[in-house]
Each structure stands twice: as structure tokens, then as C-alpha cells.
Amino acid sequence: MELQLVREYGARPWDGVVVPLGEGDLEGYQGPWEKELAAVRASGRFAGKAGEIYRFSALTEGGLTQIFLLGLGKNWDLERVLDDCAKVYRQCQELRLGAVCTDLRGLEPQFTPALFQKAAEAAALTGYRFDKYKTVPTPAGIRTAAFLCEESERYEAALAEAEVSARATCIAVSYTHLTLPTN
């Protein structure tokens, strides 16, 4: 899986867009889906509570895009961000969305590089598959996970650390699969 930082949505059609929002920060998002988010907010279906995921579809120039609102709650910690991001990226994978963009603009500057690293790790680990002994390999899911942020240079080192950490985790898990006795 390719991880990248982007400063704008650009011409690329995204199959899925993840919009993480803190509880009570639903007004902070400014982007192409402001009207849809306002309607969801008015309906009371999404409050931004930790682990809450709300999905809707939006018609864009590139076709139908799946929009995921991800609730981060009031207090963001590393493990919660890792777990909650992993949940939403697994949903993207199950829907076989090839290109997913996570829009962090509503969270900056509170979203620290350490929190960003956990979000990027979650995306990278979602792509892990151990298919060595399967007759039919698991179909590929997310090929590109991008993170949209205004201060991309702030997160460059964290992105590199996330890639290394995720790769090391995948190697360790693969090694475990190869060395454990089968019953």
C-alpha cells in the first residue's frame, strides 16, 4: 500500500474519504461535503463520539464516493486513534475501495505528529495479508491511502516512521505465522 501526504483533493477520484472529527468539533470541517455533514449533524445521527462511524455516499465528478465520518471523542490518545482508524480502514477494505483519502484539515493543529503516525500505521496495517498457504489469495483492498492536510511538512517524519513501524509489524506477524506449529 502506498501512503502519501496531499495538500488538496486534486483531480484524483477518491473511492473513499475519511473525515475524523472530535466530539463537539462537528463545525470544524470545511470541505466539499459541508452540506452533507450539516444534514447529518442536524439529524443527530453522528455526534463524533469515540469509535463512532457514519457512512454515506456522495456523487462526485469521479463517480460515487463513500464518505466515512469517524468520531474521535473528546480526549484523543494514541491507542484510541490507532484502533478507531483501523476500524474505518477495515470498512474501506471490505468495500474494496482502492484509493482512500483521510481529510485532517478540521483537526489541525491539535492532531499531533504522534497521533498522525498512529492513523497512518492503521492504514498501512490494513493492507497486510498473509496468503502463503491460501489456495485463493485475499483480494487486494486499499492501494493508496492519502492524508489531506494543510501542514504536510509537519507530518512527513511521522509518515516515514509509520511506514517503518507497520512494515516491522507485518514482518513479525509473518514470522510468527511461519514458525508456529500447526495443529
Model-derived features: positions:
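Short amphipathic alpha-helical segment within the helicase RecA-like ATPase core
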Residues: M1-L178
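A short, hydrophobic C-terminal helix/tail in secreted or cell-surface proteins
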Residues: T179-N183
